[in-house]
């Protein structure tokens, strides 16, 4: 783990390039990496320990903390307007800064607010969950939901800096910790057999630094080649087509609770897209080892209806990502109705 904690990666996107710092204690030393001598809006949610946002605010010359309610419901126009209003009331200008401190919801919301406030101001992402550290904190996707349709209104807005402080995972509930690992399993399946092997054989808590860094390197390489998802970045949607459909349907009975987290839904969404039965069996074994669900009860028709609203669906067609074997993938465009036989495969 020590070989990876202390890593600096650089997202190479020309004038929009930025550093990704993976380092213990980096959140309380944000001032070493970023210019904080301006007005700073620190956006967080009620599920994030308050000391993390305060830790950032204390390093700033002039800061305000904006706290939204925990959960996907905060990715709404109403909450977005509230955040923007607080930024305006704080007197923020074009040279000021938004810092997200939290998980994927906070990053999406704060990043989108930064992208549209005065036509775009600086944004720093400080993820505090495994899901956001491993995946959503880099790449520039920001969005809010429209009703039950996820991420349908948004923008590509790259952060100026990403600070990944693994120390913040110490306060993360166990189920949330495991939930985020689904995106790392995805990276292993698509392009990194060694990463997948960690999940099969190792104690993930002992290797979390390596898991984070390997996952970030994979996503970084994809985004650098296809920033706005015109081609190969679509690979990152592996598991998300069915996963988003499951996530959007209300009242799903999960293995442990009513309602599944995003990573749990992605995990379920990946299984039908794995063409090798042997690999599918190995992945189910990994899920059981980690504590991710391998099955759930859902209404197939409702899930299919939700997938019609998927951003990848056009004219009744949808591009899906299939994995024929470990470390390889392909994109395939099929009728949305063609997803029907895949929906009952996770058992």
Each model region followed by its residue ranges:
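Short glycine/serine/threonine-rich phosphate/pyrophosphate-binding segments
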Residues: 105-112, 133-134, 244-245
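Alpha-helix C-terminal capping segments
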Residues: 109-120, 249, 275-276
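Active-site segments that bind and position negatively charged phosphate/pyrophosphate groups
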Residues: 198-302
């Amino acid at each position: 783990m020590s070989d990876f904690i202390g890593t600096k990666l650089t997202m190479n996107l020309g004038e929009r390039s930025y550093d990704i710092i993976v380092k213990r204690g980096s959140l309380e030393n944000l001032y070493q990496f970023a210019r904080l001598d301006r007005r700073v809006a620190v956006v967080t949610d009620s599920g994030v320990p308050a000391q993390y946002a305060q830790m950032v605010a204390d390093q700033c010359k002039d800061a305000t903390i904006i706290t939204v309610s925990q959960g996907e419901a905060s990715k709404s126009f109403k909450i977005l307007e509230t955040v923007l209003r607080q930024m305006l009331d704080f007197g923020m200008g074009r040279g000021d800064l938004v810092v997200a401190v939290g998980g994927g919801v906070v990053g999406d919301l704060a990043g989108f607010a930064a992208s549209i406030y005065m036509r775009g101001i600086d944004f720093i992402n400080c993820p505090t969950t495994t899901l956001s550290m491993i995946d959503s904190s880099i790449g520039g996707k920001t969005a809010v939901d429209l009703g039950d349709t996820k991420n349908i209104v948004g923008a590509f807005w790259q952060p100026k800096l990403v600070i990944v402080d693994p120390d913040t995972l110490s306060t993360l509930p166990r189920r949330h910790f495991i939930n985020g690992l689904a995106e790392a399993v995805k990276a292993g399946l698509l392009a990194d057999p060694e990463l997948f092997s960690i999940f099969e054989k190792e104690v993930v808590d002992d290797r979390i630094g390596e898991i984070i860094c390997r996952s970030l390197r994979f996503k970084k390489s994809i985004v650098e080649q296809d920033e706005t998802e015109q081609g190969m970045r679509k690979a990152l949607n592996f598991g998300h087509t069915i996963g988003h459909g499951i996530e959007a349907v209300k009242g799903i009975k999960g293995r442990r609770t009513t309602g599944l987290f995003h990573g749990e839904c992605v995990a379920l969404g990946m299984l039908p897209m794995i063409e090798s039965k042997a690999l599918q069996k190995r992945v189910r074994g990994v899920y059981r080892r980690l504590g991710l669900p391998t099955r759930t009860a859902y209404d197939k028709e409702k899930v299919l209806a939700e997938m019609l609203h998927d951003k990848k669906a056009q004219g009744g067609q949808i591009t899906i990502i299939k994995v024929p074997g470990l470390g390889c993938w392909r994109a395939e465009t099929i009728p949305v109705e063609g997803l029907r036989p895949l929906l009952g495969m996770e058992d």
